[in-house]
Swiss-Prot record:
Belongs to the DNA glycosylase MPG family. InterPro entries: Formyl_transferase-like_C_sf, MPG, MPG_sf. The keyword DNA repair applies. The lineage of its organism: Bacteria, Pseudomonadati, Bdellovibrionota, Bdellovibrionia, Bdellovibrionales. Pfam families: Pur_DNA_glyco. This is Putative 3-methyladenine DNA glycosylase. It comes from Bdellovibrio bacteriovorus (strain ATCC 15356 / DSM 50701 / NCIMB 9529 / HD100). GO terms for biological process: base-excision repair. Its EC number is 3.2.2.-. Keywords: DNA damage, DNA repair, Hydrolase. NCBIfam families: 3mg. One of its GO terms (molecular function) is DNA binding.
Length: 192
């Protein structure tokens, strides 16, 4: 079942946790590729110094953050890596969830950590060819190049590990907020 747009209107921290175990569907030249979401980070808009929309900063890059929840927000970091986010809440509350790691489906056996290609936000975008052309897409539409489904993969609260976000030291105390979530003991987690 495709997640409806209303799924993304909920509290961003809740959406970040609820996305764990859901399936990202990526339309490519070779068909639909699927990946289970393993790790996320919540970014809480104008009150969050780690968020691109902190203090209501509006730029060409952040335009998609000011759409209603359920749209994609893709930006470049370090001049070479793209990062995929899902916009949450409504256009009055520009918040998002960063997709930090996914597991390609169908799952493969006997993988080693050094062989993983989707255990980081830049790595997963490179692997699936996600770029700025994927910015602003409607994640609740099956016709979109990116959409998210619930395929009955159950995740209990005990399986979800909350911890500090990665790479946001510039945000002061907000860097320590426990807004990164990942599935306990999962091989594809980017950092423990």
């Amino acid at each position: 079942m495709i997640l409806p747009q209303e799924f993304y209107f909920e509290d961003t921290t809740l959406v970040a946790q609820s996305l764990l175990g859901k399936v990202l569907n990526i339309r490519t030249d070779s068909g639909i590729q699927k990946a289970r979401i393993i790790e996320t980070e919540a970014y809480l808009g104008i009150e969050d110094p780690a968020c691109h929309t902190f203090e209501d900063r509006r730029t060409e890059r952040t335009k998609s953050m000011y759409l209603d929840g359920g749209h994609s927000y893709v930006y470049m970091i370090y001049g070479m890596y793209f990062c995929l986010n899902f916009v949450t809440r409504t256009h009055q509350h520009p918040e998002a969830v960063l997709i930090r790691a996914v597991e390609p489906l169908p799952a493969q056996e006997n993988l080693r950590k050094k062989d993983l290609k989707t255990n980081g936000p830049g790595k997963l975008c490179k692997y699936y060819g996600i770029t700025r052309k994927h910015d602003g897409l409607k994640l609740w539409k099956k016709s979109s190049d990116l959409y998210v489904t619930d395929e009955d993969f159950k995740v209990s609260k005990k399986q979800i590990i909350p911890t500090a976000r990665v790479g946001v030291d510039y945000a002061g105390e907000a860097a320590k907020w426990p807004l990164r979530f990942y599935l306990r003991d999962h091989l594809f987690v980017s950092k423990k």
